[in-house]
From Swiss-Prot:
Keywords: Membrane, Transmembrane, Transmembrane helix. Belongs to the nematode receptor-like protein sra family. It comes from the Eukaryota. It is a multi-pass membrane protein. PANTHER family: SERPENTINE RECEPTOR CLASS ALPHA-1-RELATED, SERPENTINE RECEPTOR CLASS ALPHA-10. GO terms for molecular function: G protein-coupled receptor activity; olfactory receptor activity. It is found in: Membrane. The gene is sra-6. This is Serpentine receptor class alpha-6. One of its GO terms (cellular component) is cilium. InterPro entries: 7TM_GPCR_serpentine_rcpt_Sra, Nematode_rcpt-like_serp_alpha.
Length: 329
């Protein structure tokens, strides 16, 4: 076996470090919690949520990508721990070939990009729900299916694009690692992903404010006002998820980028210490079902109280005009 396939001393030190093992255990804990949270999130989305059918389709697709990522990364985390505990005496058996890792890396990228593109798909669907003159069940399903297919194509192609011309001739510590020949392309993907999550956040806030602005147009029509409030609440939940994803994604991409820039100026041990904790994708995958459950339950409770207020509230026309004027100032 060639020397290229044998782990260097710094790789062995990294695998043997307490920081690496702790970070992998934390990631595995996040993965396990994500599985349980996803189970309850799926039940709530299907049976108890206030979302339109198109939104449910996309939320379930996002939950699929969440678990696809967690499963693929969880397998690799277990492998890292196994090599760190039991294979340090076999340095020429630790590394994995980039050729064998390529299919696994592509699956990992499908899950990663699927979570990001899926959030964009949710916001596009919310835009349709907000600005379309009619958004009936049949139209909602058609839009949801079309957007989900676009997300599927984009997420599936991401891994293939990153590895497009990679010769895959090297060896790596784990299949989640990117070979040197495609690092610039992967860095570009990370930056674009952060920009996209920022775009998602801005669009979600714009849609939310747009809905709030016209909330009182139907003040004296209980049914129409309820539909408008339902739209605001469902969009608010998606906006909340977009904010969470942006914060974690910014921490990931910005942290990794800074570490790569200063890598030559710091010790390898310092670089690997921080890069283990900047990799926040397992927490992005965990927070999606957890926050989804939280928002649905909180909104349902608040919605019940608001419905009581809508049906019992008495307001004069002058009060209504004053409220509209205050809203526009």
């Amino acid at each position: 076996m060639s020397n290229l396939s044998c782990a260097a001393p710094d790789v062995l030190e990294r695998l043997d470090s307490f920081n690496m093992k702790l970070s992998q255990f934390v990631d595995l804990l996040a993965i396990i919690l994500a599985f349980f949270a996803s189970y309850f999130a799926i039940k709530i989305v299907i049976n108890q949520s206030f979302f339109e059918l198109s939104t449910k389709i996309l939320l379930l697709q996002n939950l699929f990508y969440t678990n696809l990522y967690q499963i693929s990364y969880g397998i690799e985390a277990i492998g890292m721990l196994y090599r760190g505990f039991f294979m340090l005496s076999e340095p020429c058996s630790i590394l994995q070939s980039e050729t064998s890792c390529a299919p696994y890396f592509k699956v990992l990228m499908i899950g990663t990009s699927g979570m990001i593109f899926g959030q964009t798909g949710l916001l596009i669907e919310r835009a349709f729900a907000t600005f379309a003159t009619t958004y009936k069940t049949k139209k909602s399903v058609y839009i949801g299916v079309c957007i989900s297919l676009i997300v599927l194509v984009c997420s599936t192609s991401s891994g293939f694009i990153i590895l497009w011309d990679d010769p895959l001739e090297g060896w790596t510590i784990g299949c989640f690692a990117v070979s040197k020949s495609v690092v610039p392309r992967f860095n570009l993907f990370s930056i674009l992903s952060t920009v996209l999550t920022l775009f998602n956040l801005i669009v979600s806030i714009f849609i939310q404010r747009y809905n709030k602005r016209f909330e009182f147009e139907t003040r004296f029509k209980v049914g129409a006002r309820f539909q408008k409030q339902e739209l605001i609440e469902s969009t608010g939940a998606i906006c909340f998820l977009a904010l969470s994803q942006f914060l974690w994604m910014f921490m990931y991409s910005f942290g990794i980028l800074i570490l790569r820039i200063i890598r030559e100026d710091i010790l390898p041990s310092t670089f690997y210490f921080w890069i283990a904790w900047c990799y926040t994708m397992p927490f992005i995958a965990l927070m999606f079902p957890v926050l989804l459950i939280y928002r649905i339950r909180k909104t349902r409770a608040r919605r019940t109280e608001k419905m009581k207020g809508i049906t019992t509230e008495k307001q004069t026309q002058d009060d209504h005009i004053k409220q509209i004027n205050a809203m526009w100032t």
